[in-house]
Amino acid sequence: MKYEKLRQAVYEANVGIVKAGLVVLTWGNASGVDRTAEDGGEGGVMGIKPSGVEYEKLTPADIVIVSLATGKVVDGAGRPSSDTPTHWHLYRSFPSVGGVVHTHSLYATSFAQAQRDLPCLGTTHADHFYGTVPVTRAMTAEEIATEYELNTGKVIVETFREKKIDAAQIPAVLVASHGPFAWGTDVMKAMENAIVLESVARMQLQSYQLNAGVKAIPAALLDKHYLRKHGANAYYGQKK
């Protein structure tokens, strides 16, 4: 099977987000990239779940391969996810991203629908996201009517650039009135970040219910928890 390693990883992440409870019916997708693949054109290829296929019936061979240069299918019998242009634009805009996950998970989607940012209220959030996970602006009628999925990606990138957010430090976003996207250095890390995003969104909602005036944690505590795992002198976990 061509692109076997990429297809297997993307398949496992798609199955993983279902097992993690982030997906209802077919409301979600995961993708990964191989930026070294020469036959996909400049920039390599991405693999993504086919559109509308039930997860119980999904196999690695079903994963559709798309050129990062053109956004066109280069291998695979099915149609790629309808969200493919969003994933494609994120890969093109954020070179450090190796995997993207989109779901309609309950709590993160609730914040997206409320058009609320997800500020860092505690250390669980700080261990994974270096500050507020932003919500995008609402899309215009023209953006929705023309190339909607591609414009979704463009609005995400616009949000990060205008707010000067490092996509490697905040590997997630809430698309207004839509839902969450998460990413990582590879597709399994993107899946992990999607799981964490849903968990901290649930914690946030319950924190607001207990204390409506709760504030973001102090910068010193945010720095301590994020940098001990991700900083130049990180010491969390075992040495590789």
For the regions a language model picked out, list residue spans one by one:
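Glycine-rich flexible loops
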Residues: 1-240
